[in-house]
């Protein structure tokens, strides 16, 4: 399977360059989310608190602020625009026709924005995912949709729908707890989060993993657990980034083959389907 980032693009993408030059309210401007009022969507949290002061950034060419849930060079697409939704379908069709077996759907909780909400996990997002799944099922055989929703299990389970949204969903909270359990020599961190994990449709499955291309995220742990993870896995202050640890698998485990094998044995023995990020298979 391959990565499909549908929430945002680069600010260098031709869509954004075209949008910032287009008149307000025009077809191409509406590929992105713009405002002249930075109080709009004020209840949405800032995800990268260490680098981004706001979810809005001023664009001098457009003479307006654009919305971004992540870095300011990653403007969010406007999923209220049917043309944007169709662009996503076209992109997926292209890659499916080339033989891709599935897609990791990046940052799916943030596709839509509504005033008076935190702009996460909105009903409109699930309506769109059902449309996307129906499109894939109607036009392609045996394709997989994997949701990236860095949430607690009871929240991320919503991205399975009734078996009509994503086939799989990352289980983010279990990942740091595997590292925690091995260091503590105690199964409790793992068992505790498994006990908090709801039942899901029979046709769906959790994806479990040790590392990916992002930092080892510590969003889905308690403050006490986060402090413990920083203490034992990121003694170098430069390893801390945002709410996580930027180290690869082998350095996290002291480049010790036995520890690496132990973590992989644990990964393959837990409920769920193991997911291996390509560049981390052997390191």
Predicted regions and their residues:
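Active-site and adjacent substrate-binding regions of carbohydrate-active enzymes
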Residues: 1-281
């Amino acid at each position: 399977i391959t990565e499909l980032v549908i929430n945002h693009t680069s600010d260098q993408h031709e869509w954004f360059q075209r949008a910032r030059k287009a008149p307000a309210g025009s077809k191409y401007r509406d590929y992105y989310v713009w405002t002249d009022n930075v109080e709009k969507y004020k209840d949405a949290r800032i995800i990268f608190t260490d680098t981004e002061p706001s979810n809005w950034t001023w664009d001098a060419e457009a003479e307006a602020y654009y919305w971004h849930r992540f870095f300011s060079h990653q403007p969010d697409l406007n999923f209220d625009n049917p043309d944007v939704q169709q662009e996503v379908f076209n992109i997926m069709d292209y890659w499916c026709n080339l033989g891709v077996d599935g897609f990791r759907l990046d940052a799916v909780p943030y596709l839509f924005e509504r005033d008076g909400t935190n702009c996460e996990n909105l009903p409109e997002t699930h309506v769109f995912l059902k449309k996307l799944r129906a499109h894939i099922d109607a036009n392609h055989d045996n394709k997989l949709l994997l949701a990236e929703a860095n949430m607690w299990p009871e929240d991320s389970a919503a991205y399975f729908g009734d078996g009509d949204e994503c086939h799989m969903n990352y289980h983010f909270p279990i990942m740091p707890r595997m590292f925690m359990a091995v260091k503590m020599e105690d199964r409790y961190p793992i068992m505790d989060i498994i006990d908090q994990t709801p039942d899901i449709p029979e046709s769906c499955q959790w994806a479990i993993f040790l590392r990916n291309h992002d930092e080892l995220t510590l969003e889905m742990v308690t403050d006490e657990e986060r402090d413990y993870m920083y203490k034992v896995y990121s003694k170098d202050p430069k390893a801390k980034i945002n709410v996580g640890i930027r180290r690869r698998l082998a350095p996290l485990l002291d480049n010790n083959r036995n520890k690496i094998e132990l973590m992989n044995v644990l990964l393959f023995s837990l409920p769920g389907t193991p997911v291996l990020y390509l560049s981390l298979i052997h390191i």
